[in-house]
């Protein structure tokens, strides 16, 4: 089946009011394809700015993280309700930097994913293996474990987009070959068909998220199970538009 092409832009902990406004303005001025879904994730202080200044109907705004409680004594956290109150409609969960630096567990990420969905947000669920895990040839075991944690608590995956990000390729300039990505994405979809059902797995978009840029994005064009990209550093640059247009 044809799944709508999806491009996510994760700004990470980068930007100021001025630079985020400039990025959004650049997207507003671009002629973007109407059949590509785009989601940008600025730092939390600039979510409302991005929402208010975005003029593109095909672009929505996401948080980079959320908590699994509605409110309370959770210093520094942000709830789905607060994210929605700022006008955003998405959140990321499970980004490798949260897993490796902040030490978030599979179960905690699953809990956050479920709570975000229950509160009406859509979710970009990030999964992927480290370089050590790749060398140990356990890529699919790791991805399956991370997905299964969510599948145990979430039955409806219609508002989840999965992003496969090989941790060894993030911010390193190293990228999996399109063939590598397709092979892994196909295996992820096959695993999902067992855990959430064949129909849901077929409909779930799986993004590639490892050092994607304007130059290498078109190389993934004919890969059947690569349904888009989760872009990091390149989303801060004009080439983000080239990535959005890479399926034209």
UniProtKB/Swiss-Prot annotation:
The active site is at residues 95, 165. Keywords: Gluconeogenesis, Glycolysis, Isomerase. GO terms for cellular component: cytosol. Pfam families: TIM. The keyword Isomerase applies. Pathway: Carbohydrate biosynthesis; gluconeogenesis; Carbohydrate degradation; glycolysis; D-glyceraldehyde 3-phosphate from glycerone phosphate: step 1/1. One of its GO terms (molecular function) is triose-phosphate isomerase activity. It comes from the Eukaryota. Its EC number is 5.3.1.1. Substrate binds at residues 10, 12. PROSITE patterns: TIM_1, TIM_2. It is an enzyme of class 5 (isomerase). InterPro entries: Aldolase_TIM (IPR013785), TIM_sf (IPR035990), TrioseP_Isoase_bac/euk (IPR022896), Triosephosphate_isomerase (IPR000652), Triosephosphate_isomerase_AS (IPR020861). The keyword Isomerase applies. Belongs to the triosephosphate isomerase family. NCBIfam families: tim (TIGR00419). Homodimer. This is Triosephosphate isomerase. It comes from Debaryomyces hansenii (strain ATCC 36239 / CBS 767 / BCRC 21394 / JCM 1990 / NBRC 0083 / IGC 2968). The lineage of its organism: Eukaryota, Fungi, Dikarya, Ascomycota, Saccharomycotina. The gene is TPI1.
